[in-house]
């Protein structure tokens, strides 16, 4: 297939398990097409932000239609470029995905989680995410992994693996301007309901700082789960595309705790990138890609409860000019190292497209 410019490009077939409100599909597909201006024909399973059992059960007619549509799709992509993110269907062990990828004129498989280590979801015990991942790797012409760790895992099953990290669009973020801390310093955490549980790893540190400094924690999420002992210091804010940026800059620093497991080592540090894009100082667990992102952006790594207390205390006690300098460095670093503009050549190359002249 000869590379074509975006001006000559027929719509790319983009297949994903979630709609634009699903973080992975938004960051790995939708935002790329918005950035490049490439035309796309999107095929998301139900168009929802997740495919959990409750979501699927409430939409059985739409599920049947989605399954039929995906089975037809492989017969209509013979001269098309296809990019498939993660999986096409939660009711698959790779047969649907490999068929679509193998029938495409040029096929790309993209993943940003350790799907090979994810057996937590109820449906994955029947329809294996690992098997879907393996078969998709073998079927695709090019594989895009979201981190070096994920790429190393994929190398066993594909000889055409490249790394494109999760990226941010700088203009989508407000940048913090006021670095003064009032009577109650504020940490901020943003993420999906499924990852809220990771906050429990730093609950003792957060509670200690709540007692010492009256620390508050803003949780920007679609979730409503009980956060146990953290409930007294948490202020929940619903995640929306229209409002998340304004909520981020209200924080004094961002936090990204992660336990160290085979699955979490595949996380692609998107929370850290979002905090940095907002000009926030940041603290994170040096697990998986986090270690490299923290080092490149100048963030602070913390592992033990005592380290979390010490690092967050140090940020609270810094003067406003020092916090502003740290936040400015974060913003500059993320724009330079993790923006869509920085990685567009590699991403377009994976799709066999040359950049616009």
Language-model features: locations:
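Nucleotide-sugar-dependent
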Residues: 197, 241-242, 246-247, 252-277, ...
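N-terminal pre-catalytic "stem/leader" segment of glycosyltransferase-like enzymes
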Residues: 1-84, 89
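Short, polar loop motifs at secondary-structure junctions
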Residues: 146-151, 220-227, 285-289
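Donor nucleotide-sugar binding/catalytic pocket of nucleotide-sugar-dependent glycosyltransferases
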Residues: 115-116, 138-175
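Membrane-proximal helix-turn-helix segments that form the acceptor-binding/catalytic region
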Residues: 67-79, 91-92, 96-109, 113-115, ...
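Conserved acidic donor-binding segment of nucleotide-sugar-dependent glycosyltransferases
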Residues: 295-306, 314-320
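A charged, aromatic-enriched C-terminal amphipathic alpha-helix characteristic of glycosyltransferases
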Residues: 27, 321-352
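Conserved catalytic-core segment of nucleotide-activated headgroup transferases in glycan assembly
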Residues: 20-38, 42-49, 169-175, 180-250
């Amino acid at each position: 297939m000869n590379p074509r410019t975006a001006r000559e490009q027929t719509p790319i077939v983009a297949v994903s398990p979630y709609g634009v409100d699903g973080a992975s599909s938004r960051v790995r597909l939708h935002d790329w097409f918005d950035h490049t201006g490439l035309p796309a024909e999107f095929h998301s399973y139900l168009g929802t932000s997740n495919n959990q059992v409750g979501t699927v059960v409430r939409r059985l007619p739409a599920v049947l239609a989605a399954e039929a549509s995906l089975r037809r799709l492989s017969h209509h992509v013979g001269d098309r470029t296809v990019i498939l993110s993660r999986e096409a269907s939660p009711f698959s062990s790779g047969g649907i995905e490999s068929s679509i990828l193998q029938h495409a004129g040029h096929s790309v498989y993209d993943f940003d989680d350790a799907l090979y280590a994810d057996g937590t979801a109820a449906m994955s015990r029947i329809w294996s995410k690992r098997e879907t991942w393996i078969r998709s790797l073998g079927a695709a012409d090019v594989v895009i992994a979201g981190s070096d760790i994920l790429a190393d895992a994929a190398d066993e099953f594909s000889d055409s693996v490249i790394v494109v990290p999760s990226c941010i669009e700088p203009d989508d973020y407000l940048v913090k301007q006021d670095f003064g801390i009032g009577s109650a310093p504020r940490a901020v955490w943003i993420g999906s309901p499924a990852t809220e549980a990771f906050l429990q790893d730093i609950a003792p540190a957060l509670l200690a700082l709540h007692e010492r400094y009256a620390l508050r924690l803003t949780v920007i999420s679609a979730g409503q789960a009980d956060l146990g002992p953290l409930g007294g210091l948490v202020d929940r804010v619903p995640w929306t595309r229209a409002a998340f940026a304004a909520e981020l800059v209200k924080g004094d620093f961002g936090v990204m705790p992660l336990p160290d497991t085979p699955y979490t080592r595949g996380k692609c540090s998107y929370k850290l990138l979002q905090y940095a894009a907002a000009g926030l100082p940041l603290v994170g667990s040096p697990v998986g890609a986090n270690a490299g992102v923290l080092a490149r952006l100048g963030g602070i790594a913390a592992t033990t409860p005592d380290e979390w207390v010490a690092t967050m205390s140090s940020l609270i006690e810094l003067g406003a000019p020092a916090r502003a300098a740290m936040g400015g460095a974060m913003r500059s670093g993320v724009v330079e190292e993790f923006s869509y503009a920085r990685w567009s050549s590699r991403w377009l190359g994976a799709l066999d497209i040359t950049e616009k002249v």
